[in-house]
Amino acid sequence: MQGIAKIKEKIFEEATEQKNRIIEKAKKEAAEILEKARKQAVQLEAEAEKKAKKVAREEKRKILSIAELEERKRYLEAKQALINEAFVSAEKKLLNLESEKYRDLVYRMILAAAVDGNEEIIVSEADKEKITPELLERVNEALKKQGKAGNIRFSGEKRAIKGGFILKSATVEINCTFDYLLKVQREELETEVARILFEE
């Protein structure tokens, strides 16, 4: 009987030791798993923070880029408005010249534009007080001295003209209205006007 008891005791001891080994191993594995999980959590947190910072930087860059584009757009709009204002102002100054200066300007413009001196001149109703028959007489005398016909005369035709004139012959029309001349030269003049308005 004692032999059986000893065998049982031995088996119990071995079972207890094995149980303890299993428990220790399980505890060790659990600790390793927890440590690994903790490290992974720290790594994931760091990666998430890194990604969040990257996203934040990208968003900031986008916002700044959009803001810069908006600022540039507003600047260009303001610049264009000032250039427009400069050209409108130039046309107003031409239209509001003193009668004598206006006549002198038109006189020189007709002499420069006349092809053979045998054209009709179309003017606005408002300009008929400034562009007078006497002015055309002066023009025709000067044209004759240049060897041209000297037969510039008023046309009965009416056009929507603010200032300046249109010379018309049987074959050609020469538009010397102020708004047209400014429009034609605007592209060339715009660069110079912009330089004057915005030079630093």
From Swiss-Prot:
DNA-binding is among the record's keywords: no
Oxidoreductase listed as a keyword: no
Pfam families assigned: vATP-synt_E
Keywords recorded for this protein, A-Z: ATP synthesis, Hydrogen ion transport, Ion transport, Transport
Source organism, top-level taxon: Bacteria
GO BP: any one term: proton motive force-driven plasma membrane ATP synthesis
Family, similarity comment: Belongs to the V-ATPase E subunit family.
Protein name according to UniProt: V-type proton ATPase subunit E
UniProt organism field: Thermoanaerobacter sp. (strain X514)
